[in-house]
Amino acid sequence: GTKRGYLFRTEAELAQQEKIWKTKATFWSEDEMADYFRQNNVRTILDLSFTKFLPIEEIRAHHDYAFKFQRKHPDVVFGHWLQFDPRRALEAIREFDRALAAGAGFVGLCVNGQVLGIPPSDPCWDPLYQLAIEAGRPIMILTGLTGIGQGLPGGKGIVLDHGHPRHIDAVAARFPNLRILAARPAYPWQDDMLAVLAHKPNVHYELHGWGPRQYSPALKKAIAGRLADRVMFGCDFPVLRYEKVMADWNAEDYSREVLEKVLYRNAEAYFAADQGGNR
């Protein structure tokens, strides 16, 4: 990734990347990163996760930087997931409205309850869920084990249960018109996540952060069966590289039809109505 947009901002955080993900940080220029996506036949949605703790003026500046990158390279960057602190909901609503009007591809909201210390089912998130419904955009909710804080004292204060699929289930029940994209394979609660997906048709599944070799047998079976039209590929760039994750997918015993659905067809269908622009 680029140095300005990189998830990890300190030397200690960069050291954690090497320890947990077994990869080293490499900083590229914007054009180099876009060329890397092209070389790997990628059209991506990037996640600006670190900005949620910043003052709103700095958040806007980072968003404008990201939007400029998307406008220059729309062939490889479909858009961005934006993260906000729900305790600053008015700021978030105003900035999301500005982002929708920016003409920089897709923009959607991402919820990371673990890092913020607020589970996704907490009512303080409700204004952002309502905002996503009104804007006609999906919302991505992270679930399962996070590498953030892993191995640090107290896990850096992160409560893993804030990423349990039960919170996605509660949100999906409370907001049946909200399009929810559960993100990460939900380890160690993969069966719980599969139950939510079976019960709540407004929930789909994106699998970044883990290669398919590490999925549970039940999840692997569901990908080729009842979830074949509702699950989609995710990488976790830059801590994971596309060439490695793609090789792992191609090594699995999936039919070409299933692989095409997971790798791009399901995402094309899911985001067909989210081609950018105003509400």
Q: For each of these PLM feature ranges, what is it?
A:
Residues 36-45, 71-77, 135, 170-179:
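A structural motif corresponding to the C-terminal end of an alpha-helix
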Residues 106-108, 117-232:
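Catalytic pocket-lining loop regions of alpha/beta-barrel enzymes
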